[in-house]
């Protein structure tokens, strides 16, 4: 293992500049001169969130900011996820390792790890709902978010109580969506869409590893195990917990999948596996916030919910806030909004 992975561009180096209203007013005026109405609107959203919008900027925001669900006419594409939402957050070698393991194999190995850590949650069958068929607000907004993001959510468990109100829980082959019953009251539809969309971003194939290995330390164990099974490092050189995970990978990853893992392991170029795990986790957390912002279409709401229901182990609240502000005025979000059919004309 050789050089560290490239760090994702979370927030700009100076958090102060991200909070500076002058930055967004300059952008607003620049976009107005260009005639880019959606970009002007998004710059005005930032000024409004910072409490610095003038009368014209406030009028633009109140005219176009959705009060309920966005009237979307499209869904997120592969390019939206991998080129736009993921801009500056790519950790390709760690991603390739996780992709080579494969979704169901990753789930089975991860579930055994979660059971060893006693994180398995009892999910009674009577708490199960099918989002596509259920008429509850919780299930309907989950289904709406799932379709928009193109991330499957086949079932939902509504429990009497759940720490954090909602989250992905370790399932035997893939993560399971669960929430507290209390989430069904006191939240608007856009708020539920933000929370569901942020969670579903972690249910994508590679990112689902974080449901079972939720911290950089634990994810690094999985990466060590994958490198050992792939023949890039000696089994004797990895940590004891990683060896247990490697035993599971040997049982689950065979044939063509093993060949893909061996190729990914040989291409892994990180001297510090923990650093790669940290960068992957950071990137996933930032991308989740961006996806949720794109889904709900309301920056002020996104910032408030991010503060009220923080979701991150490798990023700090100030970083996630700065990233949401920066991403709002990015060309990537403009392209996503055009794909969804919600760009201001």
Predicted regions and their residues:
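Acidic, proline-/serine-/threonine-rich low-complexity intrinsically disordered repeat tracts
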Residues: 2-11
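Hydrophobic or amphipathic, alpha-helical segments that drive membrane association/targeting
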Residues: 8, 17-174, 182-190, 205-206, ...
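Short hydrophobic beta-strand segments that form the core of ligand-binding sensory/regulatory domains
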Residues: 176-180, 200
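Short alpha-helical catalytic segment bearing the HExxH-like zincin motif
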Residues: 191-199
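Small-residue-rich helix-loop
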Residues: 246-249
């Amino acid at each position: 293992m050789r050089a560290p992975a490239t760090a994702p561009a979370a927030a700009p180096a100076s958090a102060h500049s991200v909070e500076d209203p002058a930055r967004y007013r300059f952008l607003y005026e620049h976009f107005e001169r260009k005639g880019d109405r959606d970009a002007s609107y998004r710059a005005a959203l930032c000024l409004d969130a910072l409490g610095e919008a003038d009368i014209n900027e406030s009028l633009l925001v109140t005219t176009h900011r959705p009060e309920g669900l966005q009237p979307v006419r499209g869904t997120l594409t592969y390019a939206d996820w991998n080129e736009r939402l993921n801009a500056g957050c790519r950790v390709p070698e760690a991603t390739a390792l996780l992709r080579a393991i494969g979704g169901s194999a990753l789930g089975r190995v991860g579930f055994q790890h979660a059971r060893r850590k006693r994180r398995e949650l009892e999910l009674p069958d009577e708490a199960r709902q099918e989002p596509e068929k259920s008429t509850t607000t919780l299930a309907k907004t989950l289904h709406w978010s799932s379709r928009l993001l193109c991330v499957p959510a086949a079932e939902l468990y509504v429990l009497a109580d759940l720490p954090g109100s909602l989250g992905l829980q370790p399932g035997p082959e893939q993560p399971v969506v669960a929430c507290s019953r209390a989430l069904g009251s006191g939240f608007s539809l856009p708020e539920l869409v933000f929370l569901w969309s942020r969670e579903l971003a972690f249910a994508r194939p590679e990112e689902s590893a974080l449901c079972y290995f939720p911290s950089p330390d634990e994810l690094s164990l999985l990466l060590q195990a994958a490198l050992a099974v792939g023949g890039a490092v000696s089994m004797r050189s990895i940590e004891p917990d990683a060896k247990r995970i490697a035993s599971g990978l040997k049982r689950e990853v065979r044939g063509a999948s093993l060949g893909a893992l061996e190729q990914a392991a040989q291409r892994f170029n990180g001297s510090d596996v923990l650093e790669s795990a940290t960068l992957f986790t950071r990137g996933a957390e930032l991308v989740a916030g961006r996806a949720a912002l794109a889904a709900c279409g309301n920056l002020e709401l996104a910032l408030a919910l991010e503060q009220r229901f923080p979701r991150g182990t490798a990023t700090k609240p100030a970083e996630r806030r700065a990233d949401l502000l920066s991403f709002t005025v990015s060309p990537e979000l403009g392209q996503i909004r055009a794909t969804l059919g919600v760009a201001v004309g």
